[in-house]
A protein has these predicted regions:
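Conserved, well-ordered active-site substructure
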Residues: 138-155, 208, 217, 221-246, ...
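Beta-strand-turn-beta hairpins that frame and shape the catalytic cleft
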Residues: 96-98, 165-167, 217-223
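Short, surface-exposed charged micro-motifs
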Residues: 91, 160, 214
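Active-site-adjacent helix-turn-beta-strand microarchitecture at beta-sheet edges
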Residues: 128-129, 134-200
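Zymogen propeptides
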Residues: 2-153
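Pepsin/retropepsin-fold aspartyl endopeptidases
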Residues: 56-57, 188, 246
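A general structural motif
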Residues: 199-209
Length: 289
């Protein structure tokens, strides 16, 4: 016979069993939720590793390959009649109302010099200023190599020209193996604004207008180009592309001094000759051997 006390004890026992079962259900549910969250985290981690490794691949592998394609190289003074004298052919071309002067070297090789070249040296058939110098300390702007000696460092201007033996390379980029090759092979190297790279116009910050000059590649030949009128960087670069230039870097413009010798070897000057050039003034020099 069940007494009231036994009934109460039994009620209490049954109530305790229900609570225990409920707690077990809650615990199991929490475990499943925790396992699900862990699974989601693991999946997300795997996805992150896969995609992050893909994004880093260009920096690790493709960048060096791209760097090797950043310049164009032209061998000079190798395809002409050996009995013909070297000279500069000057011709005018106008494209989209932008008149240009083209200086085309024949039977000559290019190098660099510090200081104004000797005007009386008849073997020099073209010269004009190459790298910029700082206004405050008169030092050369950017990497500069003269006969294998690196006289200046820096990449403020991304365009470059390297001359190694008879090969002229024009390109664009902060890093290039051609810099070290110029040092190791008694070569030449300087930096300037890039104007055209692989047929594409390169924008530059200066927005003023001036007489513009460029060292350029057209039809696998290195030429110098000068604007007859004052032009912006953009319009000058576009004109270079329009006449078929594939790659070009800037040469000092404005009234920068220089000269060339025509087919009769008559000296023709341009710009303004100063009585006192800063000692770090650099020139490209085309010379016949």
């Amino acid at each position: 016979m069940i007494t009231k006390k036994n009934e109460q004890d039994n009620d209490i026992y049954i109530l305790g069993s229900d609570v225990q079962k409920e707690r077990e259900k809650i615990t199991a549910k929490r475990m499943w939720i925790a396992l699900f969250i862990c699974l989601v985290i693991m999946i997300l981690a795997v996805i992150f590793v896969i995609f992050s490794s893909k994004e880093q691949t260009p920096e690790y592998y493709f960048e060096p390959e791209e760097m090797l394609q950043q310049s164009i190289s032209i061998i000079t003074a190798n395809d002409e009649n050996q009995n013909q004298k070297g000279y500069i052919k000057m011709q005018e071309e106008t494209i989209n109302d932008v008149p240009l002067l083209l200086y085309i070297p024949h039977k000559a090789t290019m190098s660099l010099s510090l200081g104004v070249p000797d005007k009386s040296d008849s073997t020099i058939i073209f010269t004009t200023m190459a790298a910029d110098i700082r206004r405050d300390n008169k030092k050369i702007v950017g990497d500069f190599v003269l006969s294998g000696k690196q006289l200046s460092r820096g990449t403020a201007k991304k365009g470059f020209c390297a001359v190694i033996d008879k090969t002229i390379s024009i390109g664009m980029g902060e890093d290039t193996p051609l810099l070290q090759q110029a040092v190791e092979n008694n070569g030449f190297f300087f930096r300037q604004y890039p104007l055209v790279h692989n047929g594409q116009l390169i924008e530059n910050k200066p927005k003023n207008k001036s007489i513009r000059r460029a060292l350029a590649v057209r039809n696998e030949q290195v030429i110098m180009v000068e604007s007859k009128n004052i032009e912006s960087f953009h319009d000058f670069s576009q004109a270079l592309i329009d006449i078929g230039v594939s790659d070009a870097i800037y040469l000092v413009g404005g009234d920068a001094y220089g000269w060339y010798r025509n087919e009769e070897l008559v000296l023709q000057e341009f710009g303004k000759e100063k009585t006192d050039f800063p000692e770090n003034t650099s020139f490209i020099v085309w010379q016949i051997k």
